[in-house]
Regions:
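Catalytic domains of carbohydrate-active enzymes, especially glycoside hydrolases
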Residues: 18-40, 105-109
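Residues at the starts of beta-strands that form the adenosine-phosphate
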Residues: 4, 31, 70, 165
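Active-site beta-loop-alpha junctions enriched in small/polar residues
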Residues: 8-12, 35-39, 76-79, 115-117, ...
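Active-site acidic/histidine proton-transfer and metal-coordination neighborhood
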Residues: 19, 59, 63-66, 73, ...
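Glycine-rich, proline-tolerant flexible connector loops at the mouths of alpha/beta enzymes
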Residues: 34-61, 114-122
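Glycine-/proline-rich flexible loop or hinge segments
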Residues: 41-47, 75-83
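Residues at alpha-helix boundaries and short interhelical turns
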Residues: 11, 54, 68, 82-85
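Boundary/entry segment of secreted carbohydrate-active catalytic domains
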Residues: 1-15
Length: 202
């Protein structure tokens, strides 16, 4: 397997896609990851348009191929398990649409985060438990893993249907933030997940 050097175009969010790709190519990069929702806007990927038009998808992929570059991943980092009504459902929908778009574009990797639920069904905010030394925190984790297993089982099925892979970043403030927690999610849900990065971005 050949190592591909690339970049996440969020670092050039203030440039149009073509200009951003020219900057990356000028720095010797050939692999590209673009944002499709979650925490930040997606200026380099108009998801609704691409989902609705085969011609738009062909033109979009042509932006990369005409420069000798490859779109290797869609990024929808967010918290799909967030109990806040204006956050979790939107991020979850962004993830579903990203998977559907990846299938339509022939992209294999969806870069994402596991998300973090609240501590209980009535929680208003996410709760990140790192070191559960007390029984109440074990109860919190049991609830959170139940929530995660249901959501990620759905996502696993959607990923399989679209022949894509969920590449989960093990990131702080997420239920999956270490190799141990990643393995737990895979054991609960299924094998169409991987860990593309072992460190957080800076």
């Amino acid at each position: 397997m050949t190592l591909k050097l690339g970049a996440y175009t969020a670092c050039l969010h203030d440039r149009p896609l073509g200009e951003a790709l020219d900057v990356l190519k000028g720095n010797g990069l050939t692999s590209v990851e673009v944002n499709t929702g979650g925490f930040i806007p997606s200026p380099h990927c108009h998801v609704d348009l691409l989902l609705s038009s085969e011609q738009a998808r062909a033109d979009y992929l042509g932006e990369f191929s005409s420069r000798g570059m490859e779109l290797t991943g869609l990024n929808c980092n967010g918290n799909p398990l967030n109990p806040l009504p204006g956050v979790g459902p939107k991020h979850a929908d962004d993830m579903r649409r990203s998977i559907e778009l990846a299938g339509a574009l022939g992209i294999n990797n969806i870069v994402c985060m596991s998300g973090t639920p609240g501590s209980d069904p009535d929680a208003k905010y996410p709760s990140w438990v790192v070191n559960p030394w007390d029984g109440v925190y074990m109860d919190v984790l049991d609830y959170q893993w139940d929530v995660a297993a249901k959501f990620w089982s759905e996502i696993d099925g959607l990923a399989r249907a679209n022949n894509t892979r969920m590449a989960i970043e093990m990131h702080p403030h997420n239920l999956v933030f270490s190799p141990v927690t990643l393995k737990k999610l895979v054991d609960l849900v299924g094998p169409r997940m991987s860990a593309p990065r072992w460190t957080r971005r800076t």
